[in-house]
Regions:
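Long, charged, low-complexity intrinsically disordered regions
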Residues: 1-69
Length: 69
């Protein structure tokens, strides 16, 4: 897990994180940095990872948009 600023936006890179750990990492990241919105979570191309992140954000009632690059 790596966090970094790019264009003054804080990013969380989930490459290398195991699926069972993703939910708590994402929720902690968002809740810990909610005063710095917007935030970006990088999931990679794994449909499962994207699904887990979407569910994690939905559980804590965070509005988000999914963007693919």
């Amino acid at each position: 897990m790596k966090t970094f600023f790019e264009n003054q936006i804080l990013h969380l890179d989930l490459h290398g994180i195991r699926h069972p750990d993703v939910e708590i990492i994402v929720q902690d990241f968002v809740l810990s940095h909610q005063e710095e919105l917007p935030l970006i979570v990088i999931c990679g191309n794994s449909a499962k990872m994207i699904q887990i992140v979407n569910q994690a954000l939905t559980k804590i009632k965070v509005d988000f948009e999914e963007t693919r690059y």
